[in-house]
A protein has these predicted regions:
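Extracellular recognition modules
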Residues: 205, 302-306
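A short C-terminal boundary segment appended to hydrolase-like catalytic domains
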Residues: 182-232
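Extended active-site neighborhood of metal-dependent phosphoesterases/phosphodiesterases
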Residues: 1-89, 93-96, 120, 124-140, ...
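Short, compositionally biased P/S/T/A/G/V-rich stretches that sit at domain boundaries
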Residues: 166, 208-209, 218-245, 325-341
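Extracellular acidic, Ser/Thr/Pro-rich low-complexity tracts
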Residues: 248-256, 309, 353-359
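Short, solvent-exposed loop/turn segments at the edges of extracellular beta-sandwich modules
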Residues: 308-314
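Pro/Thr/Ser/Gly-rich low-complexity, intrinsically disordered linker/stalk tracts
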Residues: 328-360
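Surface-exposed, short loops/turns at beta-strand junctions within beta-sandwich domains
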Residues: 294-299
Length: 362
């Protein structure tokens, strides 16, 4: 069987901390799973004396780190200064493997249902991972909880939810994280992760429950950190606009040389250029005023952008909302200070232009 032929490891989930009383904690999990020790028994943070809910081990070219980012009463803290976060920082700092795989049941980023409750993970975990990614660590973070597949990327860190065989039919729900999502699929399935013999590449293949491939991605060490782009406006309110709309974004560009291009589209695929060649220096520019008054046809437009550093393949990112371009039905203001006179057979009409506030004579 697979259990006797393959090396398996696991991380504790939210339900494992809900099965016993306060005195016993998640004992059922430790009855059936054995995990490595991180070097000490953290009784102050309520870790079962028979095992660790966060651990690390080396496996070939990969450093495997298991974390507990649940927030139940029997779970260790991961806030700033906590033993778990300090330990994780040390593990990442000292890791000399080609890849770092981090496993945790709860996700840092997710567009599915539970993503709306990951504020603490974003506050404490994400900055730490991004710091080490910027320092040259190649980090893949694997999560669960949602019972579906998703691949997200933010600031040099890939976040993967490989799927669940049972599935949940949960659609994308947490649109706050939509700018980071590269692929989402709610069907039941599973994923395989293969590290190349040289250790320079990692291949992800996602399949449905029948084994049919629906997504693949190759992670490489040679390309360096990819830039990433996050369009923050439009943000999903779909406010109607008649004249211009301010598109806003933030981005991650470790080399500082990438260029940003913006596009609009009615079908989210076949885009038309808005502007090209914008700087990735968000201190200099992080918005663009898009003139839509003469745009035809009127309607709801997708906005997306690409960021290209000239080394990696351009990264495309969609805004989580659309821009609703509508006709301006506001009647023009009437002219003011209207006068007329007749002198020497000539009629002169005068008024003040209400738009430009200047006198007009004919």
């Amino acid at each position: 069987s697979m259990l006797t032929a393959k090396t398996l490891t696991s991380v504790i989930g939210n339900h494992e901390t809900m099965d016993k009383s306060d005195e016993n904690g998640p004992t059922t999990y430790y009855d059936y799973f054995s995990v490595p020790s991180h070097g000490y028994i953290d009784t102050d943070e309520r870790i079962d004396p028979r095992g660790e809910s966060y651990f690390a081990m080396d496996y070939g070219d990969v450093k495997i780190i298991g974390c507990n980012w649940n927030e139940g009463k029997d779970d260790p803290s991961f806030a700033t200064g906590s033993k778990q976060l300090t330990w994780l920082d040390e593990q990442l700092t000292n890791a000399d493997s080609k890849w770092i795989f981090i496993f945790a049941h709860v996700n840092v980023y997710s567009t599915s249902y539970h993503g709306q409750w990951s504020a603490s993970q974003k506050e404490y975990i994400a900055p730490l991972l991004e710091k080490h990614a910027l320092a040259g660590k190649h980090i893949l973070v694997f999560g669960g909880d949602e019972h579906n597949f998703e691949h997200l990327y933010k600031a040099g860190v890939h976040y993967l939810r490989p799927g669940a065989m049972n599935g949940s039919n949960r659609d994308q729900y947490n649109m706050v994280d939509k700018p980071y999502s590269l692929m989402f699929n709610k069907i039941a399935g599973f994923s395989t992760i293969d590290v190349s013999e040289s250790g320079e590449k990692v291949k992800l293949i996602a399949r449905d429950r029948d084994g049919n491939e629906f997504y693949s991605y190759e992670f490489t060490r040679s390309g360096g950190l990819k830039p990433s782009l996050y369009i923050t406006e439009p943000n999903g309110n779909n406010d109607p606009v008649t004249d211009s709309f301010k598109i806003k974004w933030t981005c991650f560009d470790p080399q500082g040389t990438a260029k940003i291009n913006l596009y609009y589209s009615l079908d989210s695929i076949n885009g038309t250029s808005i502007v090209t060649g914008l700087s990735s220096d968000i201190q200099a520019i992080d918005s663009y005023d898009w003139n839509v008054r003469n745009l035809q046809p009127k309607g709801d437009y997708w906005i997306y952008g690409t960021i290209d550093d000239g080394v990696n393949a351009p990264v495309r990112a969609y805004a989580k909302g659309k821009v609703s371009v509508v006709w301006d039905t506001t009647p023009p203001p009437a002219p003011s200070e209207f006068t007329g006179n007749f002198v020497d057979g000539r009629i002169t009409l005068s008024w003040k232009n209400p738009v430009y506030e200047i006198p007009v004579n004919i």
